[in-house]
Protein backbone atom coordinates (compact mmCIF):
# COMPACT_ATOMS: atom_id res chain seq x y z
CA UNK A 1 0.00 0.00 0.00
CA UNK A 2 1.42 3.36 -1.01
CA UNK A 3 1.19 6.03 1.66
CA UNK A 4 0.72 9.20 -0.39
CA UNK A 5 0.38 11.31 2.73
CA UNK A 6 3.80 10.26 3.94
CA UNK A 7 5.48 11.05 0.60
CA UNK A 8 3.88 14.51 0.65
CA UNK A 9 5.23 15.19 4.13
CA UNK A 10 8.68 14.01 3.11
CA UNK A 11 8.75 16.44 0.23
CA UNK A 12 8.12 19.25 2.68
CA UNK A 13 11.42 18.57 4.39
CA UNK A 14 12.87 21.34 2.22
CA UNK A 15 12.57 24.96 3.28
CA UNK A 16 12.67 27.73 0.70
CA UNK A 17 13.06 31.45 1.31
CA UNK A 18 11.20 33.65 -1.17
CA UNK A 19 12.52 37.20 -1.04
CA UNK A 20 10.65 40.09 -2.66
CA UNK A 21 13.20 42.80 -3.40
CA UNK A 22 12.99 46.29 -1.90
CA UNK A 23 9.82 47.45 -0.06
CA UNK A 24 8.61 50.20 2.24
CA UNK A 25 10.47 53.47 1.67
CA UNK A 26 12.67 51.70 -0.90
CA UNK A 27 10.77 51.52 -4.20
CA UNK A 28 13.63 49.95 -6.10
CA UNK A 29 13.69 50.66 -9.82
CA UNK A 30 10.80 52.56 -11.39
CA UNK A 31 9.49 52.85 -14.93
CA UNK A 32 6.49 52.12 -17.16
CA UNK A 33 4.30 53.50 -14.36
CA UNK A 34 5.44 50.65 -12.10
CA UNK A 35 7.59 50.28 -9.00
CA UNK A 36 9.96 47.35 -8.63
CA UNK A 37 8.91 46.72 -5.04
CA UNK A 38 5.25 46.20 -6.04
CA UNK A 39 5.82 43.87 -8.98
CA UNK A 40 8.48 41.90 -7.08
CA UNK A 41 6.10 41.37 -4.15
CA UNK A 42 3.26 40.25 -6.41
CA UNK A 43 5.45 37.71 -8.23
CA UNK A 44 7.06 36.56 -4.96
CA UNK A 45 3.63 35.95 -3.40
CA UNK A 46 2.56 33.93 -6.42
CA UNK A 47 5.81 31.94 -6.29
CA UNK A 48 5.38 31.25 -2.57
CA UNK A 49 1.81 30.09 -3.16
CA UNK A 50 2.97 27.68 -5.86
CA UNK A 51 5.87 26.27 -3.84
CA UNK A 52 3.80 25.81 -0.67
CA UNK A 53 2.18 22.82 -2.36
CA UNK A 54 5.39 20.86 -1.83
CA UNK A 55 7.76 22.80 0.41
CA UNK A 56 8.01 24.84 3.57
CA UNK A 57 8.08 28.43 2.34
CA UNK A 58 9.08 31.56 4.25
CA UNK A 59 8.78 35.03 2.76
CA UNK A 60 11.20 37.72 3.92
CA UNK A 61 8.37 40.20 3.48
CA UNK A 62 4.71 39.63 2.64
CA UNK A 63 3.65 43.28 2.55
CA UNK A 64 5.04 46.71 1.70
CA UNK A 65 7.72 46.89 4.38
CA UNK A 66 11.47 47.44 4.22
CA UNK A 67 13.65 44.56 5.38
CA UNK A 68 17.42 45.21 5.60
CA UNK A 69 19.56 43.06 3.28
CA UNK A 70 21.41 41.39 6.13
CA UNK A 71 18.15 40.52 7.86
CA UNK A 72 16.88 38.77 4.73
CA UNK A 73 19.81 36.34 4.70
CA UNK A 74 19.46 35.94 8.47
CA UNK A 75 15.82 34.85 8.10
CA UNK A 76 16.96 32.05 5.81
CA UNK A 77 19.86 30.96 7.98
CA UNK A 78 17.74 30.94 11.14
CA UNK A 79 15.28 28.63 9.36
CA UNK A 80 18.10 26.38 8.07
CA UNK A 81 16.76 27.07 4.59
CA UNK A 82 17.70 24.83 1.68
CA UNK A 83 17.27 27.55 -0.94
CA UNK A 84 17.01 31.34 -1.17
CA UNK A 85 15.32 33.05 -4.14
CA UNK A 86 15.20 36.83 -4.48
CA UNK A 87 12.82 38.44 -7.00
CA UNK A 88 13.80 41.74 -8.64
CA UNK A 89 13.36 43.87 -11.75
CA UNK A 90 16.15 45.58 -13.61
CA UNK A 91 16.31 49.15 -14.92
CA UNK A 92 18.40 51.12 -17.39
CA UNK A 93 18.73 54.69 -18.62
CA UNK A 94 17.90 53.38 -22.09
CA UNK A 95 14.31 52.18 -22.43
CA UNK A 96 15.43 49.72 -25.12
CA UNK A 97 17.36 47.59 -22.59
CA UNK A 98 15.33 44.45 -22.07
CA UNK A 99 15.31 40.80 -21.09
CA UNK A 100 15.75 38.50 -18.12
CA UNK A 101 18.86 37.48 -16.24
CA UNK A 102 19.66 35.54 -13.09
CA UNK A 103 22.50 36.08 -10.63
CA UNK A 104 24.21 33.94 -8.00
CA UNK A 105 26.75 34.96 -5.38
CA UNK A 106 30.35 35.06 -6.52
CA UNK A 107 33.48 36.66 -5.10
CA UNK A 108 34.53 37.39 -8.69
CA UNK A 109 32.27 39.37 -10.97
CA UNK A 110 32.25 40.98 -14.39
CA UNK A 111 32.05 44.76 -14.71
CA UNK A 112 28.42 44.46 -15.81
CA UNK A 113 27.40 42.15 -12.95
CA UNK A 114 29.19 44.43 -10.49
CA UNK A 115 27.15 47.39 -11.74
CA UNK A 116 23.84 45.56 -11.24
CA UNK A 117 24.92 44.41 -7.77
CA UNK A 118 25.99 47.96 -6.88
CA UNK A 119 22.46 49.25 -7.54
CA UNK A 120 20.75 46.48 -5.58
CA UNK A 121 23.26 46.81 -2.72
CA UNK A 122 22.80 50.59 -2.47
CA UNK A 123 19.57 50.24 -0.47
CA UNK A 124 21.48 49.07 2.61
CA UNK A 125 24.93 50.63 2.42
CA UNK A 126 25.97 49.73 5.95
CA UNK A 127 25.59 46.01 5.36
CA UNK A 128 26.56 46.08 1.68
CA UNK A 129 29.87 47.80 2.44
CA UNK A 130 31.01 45.14 4.91
CA UNK A 131 34.12 43.68 3.22
CA UNK A 132 33.96 40.10 1.97
CA UNK A 133 36.86 39.23 4.26
CA UNK A 134 34.53 39.74 7.24
CA UNK A 135 32.36 36.85 6.06
CA UNK A 136 33.58 33.42 7.09
CA UNK A 137 33.13 31.55 3.84
CA UNK A 138 34.41 27.98 3.75
CA UNK A 139 35.92 27.50 0.28
CA UNK A 140 34.52 24.00 -0.33
CA UNK A 141 31.09 25.04 0.97
CA UNK A 142 31.26 28.16 -1.20
CA UNK A 143 32.14 26.23 -4.36
CA UNK A 144 29.37 23.64 -3.85
CA UNK A 145 26.76 26.35 -3.20
CA UNK A 146 28.01 28.36 -6.16
CA UNK A 147 27.75 25.36 -8.49
CA UNK A 148 24.23 24.50 -7.32
CA UNK A 149 23.15 28.14 -7.53
CA UNK A 150 24.52 28.53 -11.07
CA UNK A 151 22.73 25.37 -12.24
CA UNK A 152 19.44 26.52 -10.72
CA UNK A 153 19.89 30.00 -12.21
CA UNK A 154 20.45 28.51 -15.67
CA UNK A 155 17.35 26.29 -15.46
CA UNK A 156 15.11 29.10 -14.25
CA UNK A 157 16.35 31.56 -16.88
CA UNK A 158 15.77 28.96 -19.62
CA UNK A 159 12.23 28.38 -18.35
CA UNK A 160 11.43 32.11 -18.33
CA UNK A 161 12.80 32.98 -21.77
CA UNK A 162 11.37 29.85 -23.40
CA UNK A 163 7.90 30.58 -22.02
CA UNK A 164 7.77 34.34 -22.62
CA UNK A 165 10.17 34.82 -25.53
CA UNK A 166 12.14 37.49 -23.68
CA UNK A 167 15.76 38.29 -24.44
CA UNK A 168 18.10 35.91 -22.62
CA UNK A 169 20.68 38.17 -21.03
CA UNK A 170 22.50 35.40 -19.19
CA UNK A 171 23.50 33.99 -15.83
CA UNK A 172 26.11 35.93 -13.85
CA UNK A 173 28.01 35.66 -10.60
CA UNK A 174 28.18 38.85 -8.53
CA UNK A 175 28.73 40.12 -5.01
CA UNK A 176 25.09 40.71 -4.07
CA UNK A 177 24.83 41.61 -0.40
CA UNK A 178 21.49 39.81 -0.03
CA UNK A 179 23.03 36.56 -1.34
CA UNK A 180 26.48 36.50 0.20
CA UNK A 181 25.19 36.07 3.76
CA UNK A 182 23.11 33.03 2.85
CA UNK A 183 24.26 29.57 3.94
CA UNK A 184 22.21 27.88 1.21
CA UNK A 185 22.31 27.96 -2.58
CA UNK A 186 20.83 31.33 -3.49
CA UNK A 187 19.88 33.25 -6.61
CA UNK A 188 18.55 36.66 -7.56
CA UNK A 189 16.13 36.71 -10.51
CA UNK A 190 15.85 39.92 -12.54
CA UNK A 191 12.61 39.02 -14.32
CA UNK A 192 12.78 41.91 -16.78
CA UNK A 193 13.35 45.65 -17.13
CA UNK A 194 10.82 47.89 -15.43
CA UNK A 195 12.03 50.62 -17.80
CA UNK A 196 11.10 48.59 -20.89
CA UNK A 197 7.46 48.70 -21.92
CA UNK A 198 7.74 45.40 -23.80
CA UNK A 199 9.02 43.48 -20.77
CA UNK A 200 6.39 45.02 -18.54
CA UNK A 201 3.52 44.33 -20.95
CA UNK A 202 4.70 40.70 -20.94
CA UNK A 203 4.05 40.63 -17.19
CA UNK A 204 1.08 42.99 -17.39
CA UNK A 205 -1.63 40.51 -16.43
CA UNK A 206 -2.25 38.52 -13.30
CA UNK A 207 -2.23 35.28 -15.30
CA UNK A 208 1.16 36.08 -16.85
CA UNK A 209 2.66 36.59 -13.39
CA UNK A 210 1.12 33.32 -12.20
CA UNK A 211 2.79 31.65 -15.19
CA UNK A 212 6.09 33.37 -14.42
CA UNK A 213 5.93 32.07 -10.85
CA UNK A 214 5.19 28.61 -12.22
CA UNK A 215 8.26 28.68 -14.49
CA UNK A 216 10.49 29.69 -11.56
CA UNK A 217 8.91 27.00 -9.37
CA UNK A 218 9.53 24.39 -12.07
CA UNK A 219 13.25 25.15 -11.85
CA UNK A 220 13.11 24.80 -8.07
CA UNK A 221 11.43 21.40 -8.29
CA UNK A 222 14.10 20.20 -10.71
CA UNK A 223 16.75 21.43 -8.25
CA UNK A 224 15.37 19.15 -5.54
CA UNK A 225 14.88 16.06 -7.73
PLM regions: where:
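Catalytic-core regions of hydrolytic enzymes
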Residues: 2-135, 141-155, 162, 172, ...
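Active-site-adjacent mobile loop/cap segments within catalytic or ligand-binding domains
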Residues: 141-225
Amino acid sequence: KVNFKKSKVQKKKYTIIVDAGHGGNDSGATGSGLREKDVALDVAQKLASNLKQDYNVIMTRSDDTFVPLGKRAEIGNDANADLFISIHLNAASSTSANGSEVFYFSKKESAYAAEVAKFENSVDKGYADVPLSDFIINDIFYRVNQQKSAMLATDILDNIVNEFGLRKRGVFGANFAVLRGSNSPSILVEIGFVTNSGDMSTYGTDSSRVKLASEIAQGVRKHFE
